Curated annotation (Swiss-Prot):
E.C. number: 6.1.1.3
Catalytic activity, reaction form: tRNA(Thr) + L-threonine + ATP = L-threonyl-tRNA(Thr) + AMP + diphosphate + H(+)
Protein name (Swiss-Prot/TrEMBL): Threonine--tRNA ligase
Residues the entry annotates as binding Zn(2+): C333, H384, H510
Region (Catalytic), start-end ranges: 242-533
Amino acid sequence: MPVITLPDGSQRTFDQPVSVAEVAASIGAGLAKATLAGKVDGKLVDACDKIDHDATLQIITPKDEEGLEIIRHSCAHLIGHAVKQLYPTAKMVIGPVIDEGFYYDIAYERPFTPDDLAAIEKRMQQLIDTDYDVVKKMTPRAEVIDVFTSRGEDYKLRLVEDMPDEQAMGLYYHEEYVDMCRGPHVPNTRFLKAFKLTKLSGAYWRGDAKNEQLQRVYGTAWADKKQLAAYIQRIEEAEKRDHRKIGKQLDLFHLQEEAPGMVFWHANGWTVYQVLEQYMRQVQRENGYQEIKTPQVVDRILWERSGHWSNYAENMFTTSSENRDYAVKPMNCPCHVQVFNQGLKSYRDLPLRLAEFGACHRNEPSGALHGIMRVRGFVQDDAHIFCTEDQVKKEAADFIKLTLDVYKDFGFTDVAMKLSTRPAKRVGSEELWDRAEGALADALNESGLEWEYQPGEGAFYGPKIEFTLRDCLGRNWQCGTLQYDPNLPERLDASYIAEDNSRVRPVMLHRAILGSFERFIGMLIEHYAGVFPAWLAPTQAVIMNITDKQADFALEVEKALNGSGFRAKSDLRNEKIGFKIREHTLLRVPYLLVIGDREVETQTVAVRTREGADLGSMPVAQFAELLSQAVSRRGRQESE
């Protein structure tokens, strides 16, 4: 007689084992119809699963976060059902849930086309409309092997081989189609109506480029059509903001096949890049960092000592010269330890903060490259703080405050902070981990802001803090990090003289605020849709004459503004003023200055904004003050 305790504390007693669906039906017909699955004693189970003991139960519906994940996972299985009907020789591989959607990897004799994608989606919709039940069968391993052998599903058999020899596995039947999964899944396809397939891409078996290539079908699914429509609208807006498209429109950068994953910065884009670098240089100088520069190409001996050669070699670009092996640095930290190691260091020298705009290169898979967001050559606002264990909390607290201030200057105020703690496989004593995690947690608490733990997500040698920004489309971008590291100083023999004259290893704090400049600029382009705040805009003001008679004064204004440290250009082309205004508005120039005969006579400029606001005529000095105020606000006016 199982006694079921519901979330509100009420209890229901049953005479025999009862399924989640039956419990829901005993509560009400509406809940029974909405039931996707259940959470029994905290564990997700299918709606058909029986409960044979006293237990707590939460009914999972599409309104729950877990419910949405179940819907998406079931949609992935539905791809399999549709694909096997349309392309019977296709081999199904895996179909997991991802952020806001799902995908299925498939082996097929030819690449799928957009027409195939449309056909698969149409067949999925037809299958959903039949409202068939999804049937779960717990099946002995030997029988599972027989099922997939008879169907020629080679990849499923390879997956079964990797799984522990359990008594039974979950097989989910979508009519004639069967897939293997831990579950849970929807009980009926009526829950899958709000879905859409989104794109095709390539993939590799087990994610290894040495293995056979597969095709990946992506999709998204939501609790209802309204949520799906909102998502599609958001994606369409994101496509309009695609940094690759805007980068071309604004002449910021380009990429080409001869240098995959390497950015060709044009004058406009390089201006934005330089503003970022100069800003971060000023910020770091004001906060006690020493800027250094370290070599690009370093002997493998250093990478062996640091551990990168054995753990990261496949991602490193290497070369040889005069019988010596070298690597182009994928990260800056080992080189920064070399700078620290020059000369004797005392505890009085700590904390020592070494910063570098370090150019790094990583041999990312070509299929993973994406515009300037995911590249092979990039620059980091990288720094390493060498300090004593007692100084960690203050250094971390100062870094948190600095990082949040920097993000505000770029218009980002929605920042999530997470503390990743000790993983199962780790080095160092429990006491060391306790102190390290405690120092970072205390620093986070000192900020007065909310943060959360990520248990087990730390590096094997130490905990870390991650900063995730949310942009105007609600997308999350992991940017800043603070990594506690006692390991690299040990490997590279870094030490300082303590107060008692003993040699002690420093703690090394790896930290970055923007991360990769390339990726951060890509984020800014999409966040602002290319409408950069005045301080970042490649051209801050354009001066336009109406006729040739005003050309000399236009050039005087340009010279005066540039002489005051602004970025101004004149447009003296023999075009109608309306044409010029439209063109520079499309180029997202913040301020458009028009000069006619009246402006020449009064020595003023007629000021318009790219948003179309007419600010009237004013002396050049007054406009310079207006522009100066806009620049000094940086991106904060965009977020306040």
